[in-house]
């Protein structure tokens, strides 16, 4: 039996630990900082809407640039590991710094226009800097998957596990960061939305997440050899479009951008219809908590189920067919959520409609989770395809396409939200 050059169990666990930590940090910002900007320092809605939109669109452009840099990297540690070793500390510092800002509401009440401008400017600068530093770690984190094993089976398995672990790390922070921050404020004898509790919570969670993230760099080994060829940034950008299979993945991902907006709308339904604009309201009323648990639980469980079964489905069917199946599932589930709302706009809190919506949230979760796994596997296949046909492995630039799709979709979604907020 032929020996395959692949990762050990310990190495797999170290990588997954890093993935867990990275997603903790990501959601400190996408959930915690977003709430902090909106409800704690009270940035104008239009300001933080445009900040998030512009930063994410810039990130989408910046990602391929970073991917090109990764592909040109040649060190004794490999192509991706240097960034995984050194980027967590930088991300940690910038993440914490983003929370150290003034209070816009207080500055406005005092008529201090200079402070108001400074607060908005620092919010924008720190968020853009965070996005750029996060990219330095994110592209190599996904790119190294195709470099630590030569086994297609092990790679697909690791991608699936990575998506599951990432969702767990994300979910842990999503459901806890605001509640922990407000609990700390109560312990400090402050208002629940005071800055101190959020800053302390951000520091604690970010340091823990960064320490775990470090494991992805220190605990892995790149096995797939580098070729001698390198490409300029211009050539790398051209390669993204020239490779037909990868081009199709990019186009498909961009065409799915409206589904990200639909996800935001679904979460808005959860936040404003059931929780009066504040998810922490669910912790004050048992019936609302149960409703949120059913709906959010359906979403997360759906993701975990699809991520777990995706490798088996891709073994039996073509990956693109599985991808299309999950894409269609999420689209249909979103449409049906809207139909249910039209049928019973004032009765969605009744148990029958809660169960129906819970099932539909489960369907959307399955769709999103399955698509994410299939997309990562197809990108890995494209790297092998390019190496087979042209002798060049574009690990960084191709996996930057995954981040490009995610951030471009999020940016377009945030842009639409910001536009609606100006109406």
Regions inferred by a protein language model and the residue ranges of each:
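Membrane-embedded alpha-helical bundles of multi-pass transporters/translocases
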Residues: 2-423
